[in-house]
Amino acid sequence: QWRDRIRRVQFDDAIPKPESLEGQIAYRGYETAERNAIMKGLHDAQDDDVVAIFDADEIPSQETTQTLRKGLTELTRLHFQMHYYTFNHVIDWPWTLPVAIPFRLLKETTPNKIRHWAARYHHVIEKAGWHLGFFGDNQTIRKKLACYAEFWLNDPKFTTDENLNQARIEGRDFASREYGG
């Protein structure tokens, strides 16, 4: 039912994998350029159309989708429940990067700025969906980290089977990062 409303934007810009802090900055720039390429798929968007800016592992609930379909008048921040490794492992703080915005406001800026640098949240939808972080087996996690913008996480001290398995057992982040609201 949605096939005619989904657009695939080919992003061919290439950037080498970072090997240094300067490289990480360049890699973050690639991630930014990739997200901003969303605009290429919106060439015929109408001012009142709602644009949702989510990563592939950020899944809105059916209720949130229905709310967004009714339209928005302002930038809306979506608080997703954070899950690590499996759906049963809940991290006790909201994931707050997903946003939805009317196209008329988006075209004044960029998708990446809206996602990361928007001034205080204008409107918030709580319990809007799920962020499924680092799902999959250890090899899948390592593949993700190999192309991750935070390339410092792709370090053997974090990516060994022993560390990844222990992190699952202990219910902690594999890099022992502390989370909070």
Predicted regions and their residues:
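SAM cofactor-binding core of SAM-dependent methyltransferases
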Residues: 1
